[in-house]
């Protein structure tokens, strides 16, 4: 479906089937606050916070079955702090630590 660029206010984009695809706010033509993406079946895909048009805050992704896929923080469009990754059964796979977008530590969890 056609989308229009907003300078201020709520932005909503839709799939052809009418399901909401993306929703979030613009302020002075920049993304701000919480933005959410869904897949075509209406399942939440990801959620991120923006500040002045840049990713800034917690970002969470989900597997198609609704289990968390990964979660971490951004600061000014860069991965920062602890990021956790899960498999589609909800078991933690790994964690990573970033500082201003650079990987500092990565750890894989043992599988039994």
Where are the predicted features?
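Glycine/tyrosine- and acidic-biased, solvent-exposed loop/turn segments at the edges of beta-strands
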Residues: 1-112
């Amino acid at each position: 479906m056609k989308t229009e660029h907003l300078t201020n206010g709520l932005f909503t984009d839709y799939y052809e089937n009418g399901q909401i695809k993306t929703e979030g706010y613009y302020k002075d033509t920049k993304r701000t606050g919480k933005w959410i993406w869904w897949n075509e079946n209406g399942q939440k895909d990801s959620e991120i916070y923006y500040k002045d048009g840049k990713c800034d805050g917690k970002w969470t992704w989900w597997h198609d079955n609704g289990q968390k896929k990964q979660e971490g923080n951004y600061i000014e469009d860069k991965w920062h702090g602890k990021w956790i990754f899960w498999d589609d059964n909800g078991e933690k796979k790994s964690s990573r630590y970033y500082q201003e977008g650079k990987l500092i530590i990565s750890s894989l969890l043992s599988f039994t």
